[in-house]
Regions:
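Surface-exposed molecular-recognition determinants
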Residues: 2-186
Length: 186
C-alpha cells in the first residue's frame, strides 16, 4: 500500500522559443523572466518536504576579462537580485573569449517550514563546457560547502524561484536559457 499519491509533474509553461540572452553584471541577473516560470500560487510550499526540481540548459559567451561567475537562487518576484536568497554559489573562474558554449544546472528547492515565515532549502549542481570553466573546477556544487536553510520566506505569497547568475569581470558576458524544466517532485 502506498503512503500517498506522489508523482513527478513537469509544470507548464514550456519554452517555445529561447529566452532572451541576459547581459551579466556584478549583481545577480535573472536567467529567465517570471512569465517563463510556472505559476505556483500562494501556499504552494504548504507542507514540509514539498520539493521542486529546476533544470536549465543554455549557452554562455564571455569577453576578455570575465572574472568569476556564480549562481544565486532567490524566492520572490523573479526580478534581478530580489527576494529571499535561498542559495549563494561559490564564484568560479570563467575562461575569457568563449563563444556560445553550453552549460546546464539542476537546482532542488524543498520546504523546511511553512507559512508566512516559512523556510526553504536549496542545493544543486552545474556543469559547463570546459571552454567556459576548466574541468578541474567541475562539477560546480551549489553551494560548494555549508548548505543552509533560507531566511524567513512568505510561503503564503504567490512567488517564484528565480535562478540568477552574476560575474565579477568588466566585460559584457551573456547567458541564454534554451530549456527550462520545472518539476514538482511530490
Amino acid at each position: 500500500m502506498a503512503d500517498g499519491l506522489f508523482y513527478n509533474d513537469l509544470r507548464e509553461p514550456f519554452i517555445a522559443t529561447d529566452v532572451a540572452a541576459v547581459t551579466l553584471s556584478t549583481t545577480a541577473k535573472a536567467l529567465y523572466p517570471a512569465a517563463a516560470f510556472p505559476s505556483l500560487g500562494g501556499q504552494y510550499f504548504s507542507r514540509v518536504g514539498k520539493k521542486l526540481r529546476i533544470r536549465l540548459f543554455g549557452r554562455m559567451t564571455t569577453g576578455i576579462t570575465p572574472g568569476n561567475g556564480s549562481f544565486n537562487v532567490y524566492y520572490g518576484s523573479g526580478a534581478d537580485a530580489t527576494g529571499v536568497l535561498l542559495m549563494t554559489g561559490t564564484p568560479v573562474a570563467l575562461t575569457a573569449s568563449a563563444t556560445n558554449l553550453s552549460w546546464q544546472a539542476d537546482i532542488y528547492v524543498h520546504c523546511r517550514s511553512t507559512g508566512a515565515t516559512g523556510t526553504l532549502f536549496c542545493t544543486g549542481m552545474a556543469e559547463f563546457n570546459v571552454g567556459l570553466i576548466a574541468s578541474t573546477l567541475q562539477p560546480v556544487m551549489l553551494p560548494a560547502s555549508a548548505p543552509a536553510v533560507s531566511g524567513s520566506c512568505d510561503l503564503t505569497a504567490a512567488n517564484i524561484v528565480s535562478v540568477q547568475y552574476l560575474r565579477s569581470g568588466s566585460t559584457a558576458e551573456t547567458m541564454q536559457v534554451h530549456d527550462l524544466e520545472v518539476t514538482a517532485l511530490n
